[in-house]
Amino acid sequence: GLGDVYKRQTIAITSVYYFIAARIILGIGEAGNFPAAIKVTAEYFPKKDRAFSTSIFNAGSTIGALIAPLCIPTLARYFQRMGVGNGWEMAFIVIGGLGFIWMGLWIFMYKKPDENPHVNAAELAYIEQDKDNEEDKKATTPTTKDEKSISFLQCFKYPQTWAVFFGKFMTDGVWWFFLFWAPAYISDVYGFSSDTPTAQMLIFVLYAITMLSVYGGKLPTIIINKTGKNPYAARMQAMFIFALFPLLALFAQPLGNKEVFGEQAYWFPIIIIGIAGAAHQSWSANIYSVVGDMFPKSTIAAIVGIGGMAGGIS
């Protein structure tokens, strides 16, 4: 909601200070998206499937990064040809309006599984399968068996909260570094301006590779089905595997040397960085899902929000 207000009010920005204020509103509005999404995932999926479902919607940000550079300029040029301002104002209005429609759908259509008439008995039984699974009631949870609610300040009393905090603090910077540094790297090292077809193709391939993270979210489910491990242990094993892949980024610059590997050596760092980014997103999907293993559903959004704050600080 607040994010959509930002998009629409951007057309009224006439100074840097207004822009900063608008960005603050956007940040406040965006901050609730992931905590809410993780909580919905915990309500609609059993523990073994949560990382996979999280990796799917987590990939949505990558899809948006691929589509936005194509859609927004096209909208702006269309409205400019129609004589509606400079074009970009209406682009903000259209995107903001779509956001309000999306918000309305969530407000009026979302219901918990046991209250949703579109969820049948078999689906509800699958969603609630963890209730009867004693193996999943591990000592890792900081709450009593009735899963009482925990206040926001009380969350900081538990070591599990700090594990999520430092996990996000130490890793989110990697993703944002790859995301924002890659275009500058392509421009500085290989001389491709961001508006050239080659640069756009490289960025497209980079983002497309990161979407492999969807399969990374499936790995814990595979481990559970093959080994019989509980979801928490399976996620820890998967996260360890994913944590090793970003080390490949150490080879990105040496393999991108044009003098050694030819004029098209730029494909090596692009592919390597894409794989590292996909591994990070897979790791991130699992740490979000771990929150649901350690805390009751009523507290998941707060813990994920704390982790998101840590990632933002990094």
For every predicted segment, state its role.
Residues 154-214, 280-284, 288:
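Extracytoplasmic gate region of multi-pass secondary transporters
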Residues 57-113:
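Helix-loop-helix hairpin linking two adjacent transmembrane segments in secondary transporters
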Residues 51-76, 206-214, 308-314:
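Glycine-rich segments within core transmembrane alpha-helices of 12-TM secondary carriers
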Residues 232-286:
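C-terminal transmembrane helical hairpin of 12-TM major facilitator-type secondary transporters
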Residues 1-6:
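Short, small-residue-biased leader/transition segments that mark boundaries at the very start
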Residues 17-25, 268-275:
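Paired small-residue
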Residues 22-59:
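Cytoplasmic helix-loop-helix junction between adjacent transmembrane helices
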Residues 113-165, 189:
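Juxtamembrane intracellular "pre-TM" segments in multi-pass secondary transporters
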